[in-house]
């Protein structure tokens, strides 16, 4: 099926959906009505663009016919040629637009995310860099009008981050931050380095779409839930009532501990959000690993341990190794201005997918 057959099939389905949504039997079935409404909304832009494209094709045919029938009238011929030129330019623009609209939509693109950052190789310096990344994502979220909530964090003795888990909520969060998963390498002179030598350290970032309970159901029998007293600095118990929660998903041994909130229920709710996302992500990663051909068409290898980016402080340089992008503005990027990198990654991903579509 070529691209135009696909577009015609989308339009046919759109018209069918319009009829179904006016059917009293469908209207009375709330669940089905909502599902069909969502499907119709997701194809509306594509259908509108395709109809405009067909109108442009008709304009080309009309202009060519007018040139043939001009009968030597230079004014009519010139006007028709100008219309033909404009219509052909519009045709090219709409062909590119339609190809993009036909690309498979990532069903997670509109979702909120669970963001995890960990200091990895490099000890204290890695933990300090993890803190820099946390601040970078917080500032980027603020610039996008998103809500950024730290759900759980553990720090080392110098104020660096061993591990932090955050929820980022807002419009199209996953679509912009999904490319951030991987190993982020930093090259700089640590404050504790007396010889001025540049050290290399690493922090890892994991971005997972938030998973609602209705989307991914975990069997309660697969969970072990422990309740214990929250502890403060030095390990002392800070609550007389046991409010901290530990949840273990037994089949995968994925574990989440939560003690940030004052009540057991709030800690349990947050822990369930994280474990649901982690378990769903775990099985999604297994499925992705089994689809080698699909992985080759995405940015990077898909390996969570893959080094995706280097932040070189002496050269004020950031390099994204997956797309060969180098920017001499590290200070700007760490201040939360990630748009240039995000836009380049989205464009690269779309280009790769367009090539796959054209090769079909």
Swiss-Prot record:
Post-translational modification note: Methylated by PrmC. Methylation increases the termination efficiency of RF1.
Coiled coil: none
UniProt-listed SUPFAM superfamilies: Release factor (SSF75620)
PTM annotation (N5-methylglutamine): residues: 236
Residue ranges, annotated region (Disordered): 288-308
Record-level Gene Ontology MF annotations: translation release factor activity, codon specific
Membrane-spanning intervals of the chain: none
Gene field: prfA
GO cellular component: cytoplasm
InterPro entries linked to this entry: PCRF (IPR005139), Pep_chain_release_fac_I (IPR000352), Pep_chain_release_fac_I_sf (IPR045853), Prokaryotic/Mito_RF (IPR050057), RF-1 (IPR004373)
Keyword list, A-Z: Cytoplasm, Methylation, Protein biosynthesis
PROSITE patterns for this protein: RF_PROK_I
HAMAP family named among the record's database cross-references: Rel_fac_1
Bias kind Basic and acidic residues: ranges: 293-308
Locations listed in the record: Cytoplasm
Family affiliation: Belongs to the prokaryotic/mitochondrial release factor family.
UniProt function note: Peptide chain release factor 1 directs the termination of translation in response to the peptide chain termination codons UAG and UAA.
Domain of life: Bacteria
Protein name: Peptide chain release factor 1
